[in-house]
Amino acid sequence: MRDADTATAATDTTNPTDTSDGDGPTGESTDGGASPSAARSAHGASTSGRADEIRRVLTAVSGVPITPGNRVDLLRNGDEIFPAMLRAIREAERSVDLLTFVYWTGDVGGRFATEIAEAARRGVRARILLDALGAKSVDDELVGTMRSAGADVRFFRPPDPRHPIQATHRTHRKVLVCDEQVGFTGGVGIADEWDGDGRTSGCWRDTHVRLTGPAVAGLRASFLDNWVESDHTLFDVAFDHFPELEHAGDSAVQVIKGTSEPGWNDISMTVRALVELAEHDIRITTAYFVPDDDLQTRLIRARRRGVDVRLLLPGPEADKRFVQLAGEARYRELLDADIDVACYQPSMLHAKVMTVDGSVAVIGSANFNHRSTSLDEEVNLVVFDEDVASALDRDFDDDLRHSEQLDPSRWRRRTLPQRALEQVMHLVRPWM
């Protein structure tokens, strides 16, 4: 496995359920336990008014406005995500802007190259920005297919011996905007690894979003933010008309960008604020969980004040075992604080999702590690919509049925070599 880093918001989110017992050396099946959403309902927790309070705080913390009037469609796994993205490219009439960290050679990469080339041939302006490190293995033939049709394909921060530090600062954003009207973002890269149902070995589990409405302007800005590094052309007066985007739904959305600068960025601040604001439950799904001391402390403090904190992380099919080991060095303290940690079993878990109190959801490209919060360019959506948050909580519950929950007593008995590896990897966590 190489390194990597159709849907509805509030309709059917049911997936097939694994009936295996799932017992493993350090875990137990989560089947039979109370679901997060059921637990919240059992305690009579009301989400009424929570979103309004959280909106005020997050706006004050980040300074990023919250835009009402959007439609957010959840897309689960490649078998829903790729057809929706390809259809948007196929239907584009004026412009296609694609930004991605991963673009690998294969069937999926070929399908995207074909659709982008077809769009360019019919007169659509196609701008493709690939991270020079994440997409280093892309076949020249695929790039040539797009360029020969008229698409403008560029690479973000190619290696430069004059600026070696720059090589560690990548764009990890995943953005597609078509006709300045419809946008996509989430965790998916353009590669065969994501092409499937997320329940089969080798088919990565991920979550993406199709966005329409005024907040698409924020996604467009996150593309331009990286594009100008390679082109230095912010917009074309003769072409770009920046239309006023009409209301498309009932979701209020905040588009939060993370940049490769020292200190906490807006994404990091937003996550910490949400942890502090949580009253009932926090659900985190992430591919790479290596929290710093501050975030670890905030999660534990939330649990101690009665918040139900649950983490869903990769299991045996993790694509970066060294990052997983660095995160595992944190598990003992979390488990001792009565925070639930579950590991997804069927395939690599690559989604980046957080929900708080059943009313607010965060979906995007950023993981819960130092690289996402300090080294890389990222983009997340904060969605203020109980229907969207509830749908994601149901996805979380369903994924738990395919996961093993770590047992604290068994985790404490893991081998000395295992603990030593964790500590070694933990020492270099600032680069993960």
Tell what function each PLM region has.
Residues 1-432:
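Charged, low-complexity intrinsically disordered terminal segments
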